[in-house]
């Protein structure tokens, strides 16, 4: 059934709305000059099917990994730290310990997979929340496209796909363009497409402020949150609205799928053809993929594929009611968002009034002051349905999850139901990842979910795991520089590379790889592992930025490739690669002259090559 498309009747004096015209035809293919035009027919891979036997094997391998890891670290601290060079020995052992903590947290948060059962799409308000017979009516939904400086024609594509969404019942579907850029061209696109257009006179609160303005001038029971480049699939509404039959469900998050990723060449084919190794190369490539999973050479040069994050991490948090909102591709219950905003508004006023009047001893005077101050505070404070924060999506999730009275639930729907564009250059990628890291760390410092009442143990653990991941430089930096220190000085952080060392580290590493392979079965994680290490410099800058008390500003992620030389973004990576190469040469000469032992060199060589493979992908991306 085609949706009824309209716009909000109400508008504040500071806002502008454009009345809709007759809707145009359903979505058309993009213009040929769009870089993503050749990818229009791509379809997302389905979510990995649940398999109880594979989950049991993963859990068994994870337990073995944790036992072997604990055994290895106990041996490292008691028997193999190079105390004679403690300034390298202790930092490495500490880095290994911190990395192992991350492994423990990963296994705990991905321990099991329990998808929420789907229900039939509701038709009326009373099916998702309390409504008297007199107040009952067909369900209404607002589809929101916040935009600032994106090409209006790009937004048109998204709007047209939204207009093509279907639903099995006659409900009211309102599509709105939320233009924080106040552009005549964007206004005209909205008019031509027959959808609502909302703007405002200021950009306070950035995207969150834009969303707040939209909520003030719309009235849908459910809110579909999109980005300017979000292209909803026709089935998005009918596949997600059924979850809201559970009146505790505050929001549903669907995976973000980037349909413009470079698919690369499968490793066996690349070895056989590009390196001209023929059948032998193909055989070697297949053997490597059996251990590490599918590898496509040149695929996704910026590590943008979010499947690991959504199909493994977010999906496995579902059972604990701990998957969080990620903005685009999410559907919110208006009642939940507005109710939490009202509670926060009341709390702010209560705190301010108490601070100004609690010291007044006269009961009558105190009551008069509270009334007067309360009225003034009510005028001074604003209702903020979405937190004015660079990471408003996860912040809003934390607030909703921690409501001890309503006990709001979240649902992660594992099936991609929209498509989006990914960063096409390293500058855009860096802006986006800095925002993710800085926003999460800022929340950790100023409103840490671990200290927030109302969250369950598992919710705190899983939010804490997300925060912990952004402290990764504490262990990735030592792991990057230790081989280089050895190559130049001959000083090893491990006291001896003997049979005891191999006997402890090899079983742990092999079992860890097996557990990770089983836990991420069917998901390409290789590139993500590399970028986790290569991300160190942006991560350091975000961490220092937040620790210095600087605000993390909201920057719109560019939707087209930015031109320029981005070598300045990877100078630390280049420096580490050069030092690694020079260091290997120096130590190799010493080995040839018999001045150094071979064992430490071999271990550090393989270690350094792994580091170099991760660092080099970001260097190549800078010049792509």
Model-based region annotation:
Residues 1-44, 421-423, 501-541, 545:
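Membrane-anchoring/interfacial helices and their immediately flanking loops
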Residues 2-135, 190-194, 290-291, 472-476, ...:
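N-terminal membrane-anchoring/stem segments of glycan-assembly enzymes
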Residues 29-46, 408-424, 443-453, 476-480, ...:
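Hydrophobic alpha-helical transmembrane segments
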Residues 43-62, 144-155, 452-476, 550, ...:
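Loop-to-transmembrane boundary segments
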Residues 68-97, 469-553, 566-624:
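Membrane-embedded multi-pass helical conduit in multi-pass membrane proteins
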Residues 98, 102-450:
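Internal catalytic domains of large membrane-associated glycosyltransferases
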Residues 116-130, 148-149, 161, 230, ...:
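Alpha-helical membrane-embedding segments
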Residues 439-460, 539-542, 619:
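C-terminal, non-catalytic tails of nucleotide-sugar-dependent glycosyltransferases
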